[in-house]
């Protein structure tokens, strides 16, 4: 579970402001999560997440004080870009990034909740499908959706996935699930706060990639 627990997300303060530097430090290690799915077919999602992290980091590093929190980035870019906002800058990058992060969150939550295909209990195809349907499907065109259906054929066995999360170490499933639940606490709170922020600022867009 080293892929997740070595870089846990920090608890949010009462006002739910998300420190940009801390967020970027934690999220920058998540692209490796897709290597645990065992197929290069998932690489487009990994590449998308990596690219959006780079865009957000570039904006943050241009003025760390002005963009101390993710909320400050959206507010600053709203003023900067005017009518082009929110389809611009780090605001657009974070919009897509949060969807990729949501995919990870739903997938891990589904596994930790014990959801499975009774006919193939050691496959995580049902968990990946749920995560994709909730987090990404509505924002993908027909071609991308078909590509994802192909990717499902390469979905790993749960045992192999959990072992990959633990960087090849043999660990009991119960221990892995408990560590996933621990990781999800602050991670889920952070993702939810970003979604709420986008809704409050009317920054959410529903166009398809």
Curated annotation (Swiss-Prot):
UniProt-recorded Gene Ontology molecular function terms: ceramide 1-phosphate binding; ceramide 1-phosphate transfer activity
Species this protein is from: Xenopus laevis
Localisation: Cytoplasm
Keyword DNA-binding attached: no
Function per UniProt: Accelerates the intermembrane transfer of various glycolipids. Catalyzes the transfer of various glycosphingolipids between membranes but does not catalyze the transfer of phospholipids. May be involved in the intracellular translocation of glucosylceramides.
Protein name: Glycolipid transfer protein B
Binding site residues for beta-D-galactosyl-(1->4)-beta-D-glucosyl-(1<->1)-N-[(9Z)-octadecenoyl]-sphing-4-enine: 48-55, 140, 207
Pfam family for this entry, one: GLTP
Region (2 X 12 AA approximate tandem repeats): 45-66
Gene3D superfamilies: Glycolipid transfer protein
InterPro entries tied to this protein: GLTP_sf (IPR036497), Glycolipid_transfer_prot_dom (IPR014830)
Keywords recorded for this protein, A-Z: Cytoplasm, Lipid transport, Repeat, Transport
Annotated family: Belongs to the GLTP family.
One cellular-component annotation, GO: cytosol
GO biological process, one term: ceramide transport
Sequence repeat residue intervals: 45-55, 56-66
SUPFAM superfamilies from the UniProt entry: Glycolipid transfer protein, GLTP
């Amino acid at each position: 579970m080293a892929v997740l627990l070595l870089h846990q997300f920090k608890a949010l303060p009462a006002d739910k402001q998300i420190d940009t530097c801390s967020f970027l430090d934690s999220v920058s290690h998540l692209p490796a999560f897709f290597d645990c799915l065992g197929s290069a077919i998932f690489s487009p999602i990994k590449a998308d997440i990596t690219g959006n992290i780079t865009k957000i980091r570039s904006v943050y590093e241009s003025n760390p004080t002005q963009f101390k929190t993710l909320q400050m980035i959206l507010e600053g870019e709203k003023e900067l870009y005017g009518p082009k906002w929110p389809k611009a800058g780090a605001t657009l990058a974070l919009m897509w990034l949060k969807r990729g992060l949501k995919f990870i969150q739903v997938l891990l939550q589904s596994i930790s909740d014990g959801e499975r295909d009774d006919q193939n209990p050691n496959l995580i195809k049902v968990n990946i499908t749920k995560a994709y349907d909730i987090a990404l499907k509505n924002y993908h065109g027909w071609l991308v959706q078909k590509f994802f259906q192909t990717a499902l054929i390469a979905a790993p066995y749960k045992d192999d996935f959990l072992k990959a999360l633990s960087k090849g170490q043999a660990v009991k499933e119960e221990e892995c699930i408990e560590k996933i639940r621990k990781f999800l606490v602050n991670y889920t709170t952070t993702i939810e706060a970003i979604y709420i922020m986008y809704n409050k600022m009317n920054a959410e867009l529903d166009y398809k990639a």
